[in-house]
Amino acid sequence: MPVMKGLLAPQNTFLDTIATRFDGTHSNFILANAQVAKGFPIVYCSDGFCELAGFARTEVMQKSCSCKFLFGVETNEQLMLQIEKSLEEKVEFKGEIMFYKKNGAPFWCLLDIVPIKNEKGDVVLFLASFKDITDTKVKITSEDKKEDRTKGRSRAGSHFDSARRRSRAVLYHISGHLQRREKNKLKINNNVFVDKPAFPEYKASDAKKSKFILLHFSTFKAGWDWLILLATFYVAVTVPYNVCFIGNEDLSTTRSTTVSDIAVEILFIIDIILNFRTTYVSKSGQVIFEARSICIHYVTTWFIIDLIAALPFDLLYAFNVTVVSLVHLLKTVRLLRLLRLLQKLDRYSQHSTIVLTLLMSMFALLAHWMACIWYVIGKMEREDNSLLKWEVGWLHELGKRLESPYYGNNTLGGPSIRSAYIAALYFTLSSLTSVGFGNVSANTDAEKIFSICTMLIGALMHALVFGNVTAIIQRMYSRWSLYHTRTKDLKDFIRVHHLPQQLKQRMLEYFQTTWSVNNGIDSNELLKDFPDELRSDITMHLNKEILQLSLFECASRGCLRSLSLHIKTSFCAPGEYLLRQGDALQAIYFVCSGSMEVLKDSMVLAILGKGDLIGANLSIKDQVIKTNADVKALTYCDLQCIILKGLFEVLGLYPEYAHKFVEDIQHDLTYNLREGHESDVISRLSNKSTVSQAEPKGNGSINKRLPSIVEDEEEEEVEEEETTSLSPIYTRGSSVSHSKKTGSNKTYLGLSLKQLASGTVPFHSPIRVSSANSPKTKQEADPPNHGRKKEKNLKVQLSSLGSAGTPELSPRIVDGIEDGNSNEETQTFDFGSEQIRPEPRISPPLAESEIGAAFLFIKAEETKQQINKLNSEVTTLTQEVSQLGRDMRSIMQLLENILSPQQPSQFCSLHPTPMCPSRESLQTRVSWSAHQPCLHLQAGGAHLYHGNVASGIWSVDPSLVGSSPQRTEAHEQNPADSELHHSPNLDYSPSHCQVIQEGHLQFLRCISPHSDTTLTPLQSISATLSSSVCSSSETSLHLVLPSRSEEGSITHGPVSSFSLENLPGSWDREQMMSASSERLENFPVEVVTSTADVKDSKAINV
């Protein structure tokens, strides 16, 4: 029959063995990884060592096994070298050395370092024990001084040897025996008795089972249990029958069952012997194979009952030993074997048919027992001397009906024992199942009382067994039914998908183990209907172990209640991997029981025990955290895990605690699984010797410096060019300085206007122009400097702190006006060094120069990739903002043209023109200046200037071009400040226009002359002005006018010299409109010009 097997997977109990044989985890010892050649990092430290040295476990983990952090001023340098040498050669070291605690207090320590091997014989760990011998050392030193003064010599050596022997006894105790060397003993052949290893091996130990140990779930044991079950039922039937019906009256009948009784007794005795050699399942769910533990367990549980039930009373009859009748009653003790049936009832209740069979058997057994009692009552009344009773007893009535009455004072005659038993059983069964039929009835008082009890018991049994068999099965065995249903589903799944035997075994063991832990109860499903308040209290009680960590001391009760809802319970079997390298970390794990190891490339990086926390340092903005190593279970482990998704939700609800949690978790983690963290540890260990030379001797402390990037100093021009190439956003000053290097302002402005005409430059306004050269253009323009930038030597410093979060970058356009010295100094964005995790700035030894160079190259490449990614994101955002600005300006222009009211044209007085335009000025141009602007707006009581337009030519005296039109300082007014000069053609005299005050906008429209010319009449040229500030000290705009060629065809090229000879002297002003608004500065400054050569009659938006 199927039985719960228990936990059989091989476990690596190395940590438990060390802790147990060291008298608990409070002993002073550490374990270090012997497979990492540089530094031999510590993978486990006991609580006693932390108390001795004054360091926390998180501060000791991953430090060097040589314990340089305990060295001080008076530490013997020769012993330091010997420790390093013994670690390199992987040999044992013992010695007395002066160490220093965290607070700087010195103490003498007896240090013993022993290598630990695995099953292959390779040294994988170092076990270092520490014993404080300060008191002994001081006492011995004082005694030595006294002896030196009296005898002139020292005897301290013997005391040192005794102290060393006392400390070595602890390590020898780990092997399970003390090495005793006795003289006068014969040497035993090593081939027969091989010495056990001095220390336990670091490996997964298989269950060692002797061939004389019987598995409790084996097939033989299952068949034996069925045989013992039948023997138990035999005892339950025959013992009451022999006591009540036979007694000492019919020894022949008794002797007929003697053989079967002796056989049953022999079976019980053999069962006792087998129980001393049968495994059992402990309370923790593990299978116990040790013979001594099995014996102790059996003796303290069922041995006494089984021994009494197996006493061979029937052997007394076999050897013709006369016994009194009371000895027969001792056989009723065998009924205690039924208690064993109750113990194994859960094993037999796996199927409904077995359950029904057992219930019916128990019902029949109860009827048998009550029949025996019913016969004893009739027999006692028959033997009574009262004549009034024996005549009405049920046996007397039965004898009359069977025509075998009693006679001779009721001692002779009467029905046979067989007939009496059948009649008694018939009466009890009819009474238990119904009210009886009356053919066998109770006549005396005793019989009536027994009949009443039988009816009550029958009603109860009938209701429980026959009336509610289905309800009994569902209520009593529903959990087992669910267990076997799921087990059957699991086996069907394995059979359908043809899973291998190893995977099948793992699945079955995991299912059985998890079922034994939670008994098939889904806590989430069970608690989902409870209110949140009650559910939070329940989960806080269930997860109180992890919530009592120092990590959650600063959390409020509400935060803990919310967090407890996101804590789950997990289980891991020996050899199972909790996490694989490169997996996405989904939770933070807390080890409740068992031990685990952290592996990378088959090397042990850390050993985790009860109370350890494993995960990664967090950031609020983290999306995916990849693990850097494997986490494998050594024993059966119970875990509690905090789901990261729920954790981030809770931290979002409690921001005052979130920052504290992010800071504290990196100190409370026993091992950090964040990808990239282990390279920092190995690098720190590999350079430990170099760093220790720079640090002063004394107690080691953790260095906590902010990460930084230190670059080699170069020329100032190279720094400016490299800074410009870091980001797609440039300042106005850098653009102007670059234009001065490449050419004149006129050439640079001409290039910008060509780009504007083609629509490739995303300007925000006609007077807000910021040159933004792409990185590609920059590299093409200056390849030598770009090459020098790649060859730049980066020196990187690493902090022991965890990685910081990525800084937020807000893309924006930096105008040159933000800094008064923008034309002299280049403004760039400073990307913080917190987003980069560099290595310590150290000078590696010559043997490690290649490793350091390769590591720096990798870090530099990662940094470049991050910067390029940021540049692309900022560029994309800038383009989107520019496109949005252009769309908004187009919409505002349309609204202004629609909503602005029309007014009659206002003409200005004539103003003499000092000169006629030359061919170089025959290009339409709009210029702004501080003294004589063409279009000028000044916020807050400023004046709006405008000028008329003639022949499509606007010009301003170049000598009057000044600083930015945004200047608000007052300047001396003169008549020329409120007028606009323009260059007329031929004999036309220009006019100057009046000033329009404050909240007005003016719209001017000019059309081509009405006189006959060789030039085709143009469409109207319009200019509108709205009121925002200017962002450029100088902006020029080129317009292309259509012209007529000599053959008379219309062209759309630029105006040539011969086509302008017949240009009229003036253009007629078609109309002038002005509109008012509340605040002119709310409108963007823009100039919109439209000519015939624009496709689809669309305006050129600047």
From Swiss-Prot:
Glycans are attached at residues 320, 409. InterPro entries: cNMP-bd_dom, cNMP-bd_dom_sf, Ion_trans_dom, K_chnl_volt-dep_EAG/ELK/ERG, K_chnl_volt-dep_ELK, KCNH_animal-type, PAC, PAS. Residues 1-225, 277-298, 349-357, 470-1102 are cytoplasmic. Disulfide bonds: none annotated. Its main location: membrane. Residues 18-90 form the PAS domain. Residues 247-255, 320-327, 379-419, 441-448 are extracellular. Residues 420-440 dip into the membrane without crossing it. It is found in: Membrane. Residues 142-162, 684-743, 764-841, 960-991 are annotated as: Disordered. The keyword Nucleus does not apply. The potassium channel is probably composed of a homo- or heterotetrameric complex of pore-forming alpha subunits that can associate with modulating beta subunits. Pore-forming (alpha) subunit of a voltage-gated delayed rectifier potassium channel that mediates outward-rectifying potassium currents. Elicits a slowly activating, non-inactivating and slowly deactivation outwards potassium current at depolarizating voltages from -30 mV to +50mV. Shows no obvious change in the activation rate from different holding potentials. Activation is strongly dependent on the pH of the external solution. Belongs to the potassium channel family. H (Eag) (TC 1.A.1.20) subfamily. Kv12.1/KCNH8 sub-subfamily. This is Voltage-gated delayed rectifier potassium channel KCNH8.
